[in-house]
């Protein structure tokens, strides 16, 4: 019901005559829910603004497959690169996928974990959110055969000819499956397996470079680049930083 001017004036006078404690009790009694809803809306707004202000833009997406790195090495591979490139660490990041495990050994005790890692890699590749992968030989072979990897010789020749002259002799060739009839064999539509492969220079062994000599890796670790990466300029500068 709408109050008259006289009633409004009476309420104002009564409110002014209250003690501070009575005023607080009156406000909480009649305006508790509007106040709570207003505070909730303000908290949501502040949270959104804070998230936008502190959100970091990924410069690169990097995965570690069958490879564990310590905190110091991880820092060198992420914030070290950003600092060397003159990028603001508060606004940029190298996003990492850690603890990925790939194997084609169906008898391994970690088969379910390997399957989950394979799905995670597939999702990241399909989303365009995986650029560089550090991996051991087994992971390198699997990624190469699946056709995930970019030819590094071509990448370097196109984007950094000077580094190409130095690094191309060090690149490792691996098989890439062009076609196979394993499904047809499984369905009894073909009698013999027929797999067609070609070789590509899609791996760079890292143990000989200063940054990795004291890394303590168990065996050789290879740098590989995902074929559908859209950040090839950043990938090239990253390789130049790692192998400098």
Walk through the language-model features, giving the residues of each.
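Short, membrane-interfacial amphipathic segments enriched in basic
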Residues: 9-22
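Hydrophobic membrane-insertion alpha-helices, especially the h-region
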Residues: 30-52
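Short, well-ordered beta-strand elements
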Residues: 58-68, 93-97
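Short extracytoplasmic/periplasmic juxtamembrane "stem" segments immediately C-terminal to an N-terminal membrane anchor
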Residues: 62-82
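Extracytoplasmic/periplasmic/luminal assembly and interaction segments
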Residues: 78-132, 137
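Extracytoplasmic "Venus flytrap"/periplasmic binding protein-like
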Residues: 110, 116-190
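A bilobed periplasmic-binding-protein/Venus flytrap-type ligand-binding module shared by bacterial periplasmic
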Residues: 211-231
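Short amphipathic alpha-helical coupling segments at ligand-binding clamshell hinges
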Residues: 230-241
